[in-house]
Amino acid sequence: MLIYVYDEVTKSIRKYNKRLTDQMPFSKNKYLSVKEFRGNSKSNIIWTSKQTIESFNKFRSKWGKPIYVGFAFQRITRGGHTNQSQHYAGTALDIAQNLSNNERKKLYNLAKKMNIWSYVEPINMTPRWIHVDKRYGKAACGAGYPTLKINSKGNYVFVLQETLQNNNYNVSMDGIYGSKTLTATKNYQRKAGLSNDGIVGCKTWRSLVE
């Protein structure tokens, strides 16, 4: 199992080879396994951010007992979430599906109170689970993924590269917006009738994922 972890602070990507039974990189005290994070994606390549895992560590430590993770990482080509879902970027977790309503409400309140997540979905929108994510960057469309350009790195570049591959463009999945990703993006934009400047803004994201 190949795992890429992006660090928002250092702007670097680390690569790990792990088994499903191993702990996720940066997970402490066996809080989150590779199997739990990969979920039903069935992917042999997954990605996340260091800050996502560290936030889960703090959250789990404060809660003081195991937190069930029903859904986390997913490949955009498999779907199952909204078009610009943070699950595809590896920065989101849907948790607490096994708790009673009262216990889930307590955990939800803790998630809000700790202020360690970028977004905690309103509980009325997720009555049977809690959605938390550690998204980063200013969204190109007001919500969703940030604008990307040459030399961008990280989780959202992985999503871009996967969608380009799904459109039959020859790009590697490495999380780095290099020359091949730039060429593929420009060619896609040209074919889609968009401004082919290689900048992945709102219109390009919507064309790619919606």
Region annotations inferred by a language model:
Residues 6, 10-126, 130-136:
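Cell-envelope/glycan interface and biosynthesis
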Residues 4-6, 83-92, 97-167, 171, ...:
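Catalytic cores and adjacent binding grooves of peptidoglycan-active enzymes
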Residues 190-191, 210:
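Short, basic alpha-helical nucleic acid-contact segments in DNA-binding proteins
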